[in-house]
Amino acid sequence: MDLPKAYDPKSVEPKWAEKWAKNPFVANPKSGKPPFVIFMPPPNVTGSLHMGHALDNSLQDALIRYKRMRGFEAVWLPGTDHAGIATQVVVERLLLKEGKTRHDLGREKFLERVWQWKEESGGTILKQLKRLGASADWSREAFTMDEKRSRAVRYAFSRYYHEGLAYRAPRLVNWCPRCETTLSDLEVETEPTPGKLYTLRYEVEGGGFIEIATVRPETVFADQAIAVHPEDERYRHLLGKRARIPLTEVWIPILADPAVEKDFGTGALKVTPAHDPLDYEIGERHGLKPVSVINLEGRMEGERVPEALRGLDRFEARRKAVELFREAGHLVKEEDYTIALATCSRCGTPIEYAIFPQWWLRMRPLAEEVLKGLRRGDIAFVPERWKKVNMDWLENVKDWNISRQLWWGHQIPAWYCEDCQAVNVPRPERYLEDPTSCEACGSPRLKRDEDVFDTWFSSALWPLSTLGWPEETEDLKAFYPGDVLVTGYDILFLWVSRMEVSGYHFMGERPFKTVLLHGLVLDEKGQKMSKSKGNVIDPLEMVERYGADALRFALIYLATGGQDIRLDLRWLEMARNFANKLYNAARFVLLSREGFQAKEDTPTLADRFMRSRLSRGVEEITALYEALDLAQAAREVYELVWSEFCDWYLEAAKPALKAGNAHTLRTLEEVLAVLLKLLHPMMPFLTSELYQALTGKEELALEAWPEPGGRDEEAERAFEALKQAVTAVRALKAEAGLPPAQEVRVYLEGETAPVEENLEVFRFLSRADLLPERPAKALVKAMPRVTARMPLEGLLDVEEWRRRQEKRLKELLALAERSQRKLASPGFREKAPKEVVEAEEARLKENLEQAERIREALSQIG
């Protein structure tokens, strides 16, 4: 046997990771096997592995390995995303260290630098995924800006444009002054933030004033109206009049609009169409022309802006404007207020709003194609609740702003004629050809749009482009649609819904059959991990400390029902201990072979039990994999390996092995081989190593998934009675304070035949012998099928034992009383953190239960 005494993941995992990277599991579209396809959510090319990636890819790899073993042509398509904003920001930071900006280099040279950076550093995250054991088809690795994916993007846009679904129009958009680009609503994060609410007084035409409340006093100078609710009697007499913007000579109308909230502030709303989405909608309804006073750099500008504020940053301008309003008597009050601060999800900068031409995609007709499919039940969701969430979003979807003011990304294939201003987009049949003259007037003076597509535009094509679309490739014919998409619920709208749109529109069918949505990985307190909080758990550090198998297994084990995961390091310790337990069990089996001399070949009760229990386990675990309930599958495997195999069968097999029973050794080997197969999708490294040592076969990943054998319910029932008898004896020893190895004598009642027929195994497991008659005084432990009675005479000083128990009982009751007093205090429950209160409740429960057990034991001895 060549397994070292102790398991060291560092000596095993890199070896297998390198082997799988060099010899990837390449799919064959002509194999004739039924396909099973997963599209890997492409991580950002800028990225390093974080816990979300680790969870996401552990689940995918478990599924792909399972299906590969089930005989499917399992295809896991990997790749990375060019991550427009994120990548551009990374490279711009590198340039800043050289004292340069992208504008110093110019677009062409800057893009050369980005590609250079991508080639040098962009493969980091895929290398890290390989270290985690990801068995993707690395021969099909894709990048959202490689040649094939670029062709798909150009073709998709050409189709959308010539079908009237892509159009260019000026609208209010989210703008990040730091990243210098527009953002979709889904790329904006809103957080409650302490701020101020200012009440300002506007002079009304003909005398009097009207007061408005705002959190953005610096935008007052862009006001185009004051709106009140049509049913608000307080302002009915002012409708149709005008009000003067403070510190200016600009007069604006007072009008009625149902969007105004009567109960917010004063009930009168300043309408600033250029700087607020709601105001923009009100302005559209009333024909108000937007006026902007904040430029794209976030600075104040415009004729309406007082000289003292021009050129100031918007936040500095806010402070200064409030001073000016106060001095001029326009500030009525200033109060603390929690504002909903909208920030860029990439850099955290508070966004601004701006109006300028952008490319848009008409989502309503596209969403309707998807909704028809979802109503037919084309796509299953796990958990099912997300289907309604997906449909609700599609039913209320707005047009998608698909252009970004970046340099890194897919440059939009649209050209503007400098003579007649016509837009030129290549037609689908010539989508790769750049136009040389204007389709409208024939002029050769064409200028290409400088904007790039939103990163999610190319990501939305992922299930198609990874298979070679728009070319009619063998992969596309064989592997579309995909089977399961595994991703986090946080990108359901950003990515999943948009892939549905692409699939139904371009292929006429769903892009995948099932969507498995998992939660976020949070810290042990349920908080999001962030560098600023200092609570980030680095998966690579965890791999170094516990092993990749342990990390994978812990994450899968915790991924129940799509809920967020609170990751406590104790779960990683649990998984590492599980790996060690399995390793030691395998060493025992291999050691048992050495020098074994067969003297008999008879199935024991334990052998029959283990084979039957394994058969049930195979059936249950297979069903859980099929239902995509990997967390429960992990728990079932854990129970089967740790409890049934290691704790019970392995121990019960020792007397038979000692007696030279070949059937028992064969059962150990065969059961272990099946357990390694069941666990392989979740813990591929350790199981591959042990399977090779056990069977001599090179690649467990290519072995067949086990089929359930026959059930032996009689053996399962009999062995369960034996287990209960042993458990009862062990509990009695613990109750009496005796060491587990202490030899005792017990009297059994109930289903005792299995014990009597397997007395040697019972004695070995319990270190107990049977009494022929029921003792008068004894500690009693009742189990569902067996009751055990253990007299204390001759084992210990009964009176001394009684004194110790009574003393402990008093201590426990005192502790329980202290907890009850603390929990009864309103101050404690109101002020103490929730986890502190829960811990105190758990202490009280445990102490009361222990006290009850001691009372019962004392009453039994008399």
Curated annotation (Swiss-Prot):
GO terms under cellular component: cytosol
GO molecular function, one term: metal ion binding
Result of changing R818A: Increase in KM for tRNA(Val), without change in kcat
Residues that coordinate or bind Zn(2+) 1: C176, C179, C344, C347
Alphabetical list of SUPFAM superfamilies matching this protein: Anticodon-binding domain of a subclass of class I aminoacyl-tRNA synthetases, Nucleotidylyl transferase, tRNA-binding arm, ValRS/IleRS/LeuRS editing domain
Swiss-Prot/TrEMBL catalytic activity: tRNA(Val) + L-valine + ATP = L-valyl-tRNA(Val) + AMP + diphosphate
CDD domains for the chain: Anticodon_Ia_Val, ValRS_core
Phenotype when changing T272A: Decrease in posttransfer editing activity. No change in aminoacylation activity
UniProt keywords, alphabetically: Aminoacyl-tRNA synthetase, ATP-binding, Coiled coil, Cytoplasm, Ligase, Metal-binding, Nucleotide-binding, Protein biosynthesis, Zinc
Details of cofactor binding: Binds 2 Zn(2+) ions per subunit.
Ranges in coiled-coil conformation: 802-862
Positions marked as site (Interaction with tRNA): R570
Binding site for AMP: H50, H53, T487, G488, D490, H518, V521, M529
Entry EC no(s): 6.1.1.9
Residues given in the record as L-valine binding sites: P42, N44, D81
Binding site for Zn(2+) 2: C417, C420, C438, C441
Location(s) in or outside the cell: Cytoplasm
Source superkingdom: Bacteria
Swiss-Prot/TrEMBL cofactor(s): Zn(2+)
Amino-acid biosynthesis among keywords: no
InterPro entries: aa-tRNA-synth_I_CS, aa-tRNA-synth_Ia, Anticodon_Ia_Val, M/V/L/I-tRNA-synth_anticd-bd, Rossmann-like_a/b/a_fold, tRNA-bd_arm, tRNAsynth_Ia_anticodon-bd, Val-tRNA_synth_C_sf
Family matches, as PANTHER family: VALINE--TRNA LIGASE, CHLOROPLASTIC_MITOCHONDRIAL 2, VALYL-TRNA SYNTHETASES
Role: Catalyzes the attachment of valine to tRNA(Val). As ValRS can inadvertently accommodate and process structurally similar amino acids such as threonine, to avoid such errors, it has a 'posttransfer' editing activity that hydrolyzes mischarged Thr-tRNA(Val) in a tRNA-dependent manner.
Domain remarks: ValRS has two distinct active sites: one for aminoacylation and one for editing. The misactivated threonine is translocated from the active site to the editing site. The C-terminal coiled-coil domain is crucial for aminoacylation activity.
Subunit structure: Monomer.
Name assigned to this protein: Valine--tRNA ligase
Gene that encodes it: valS
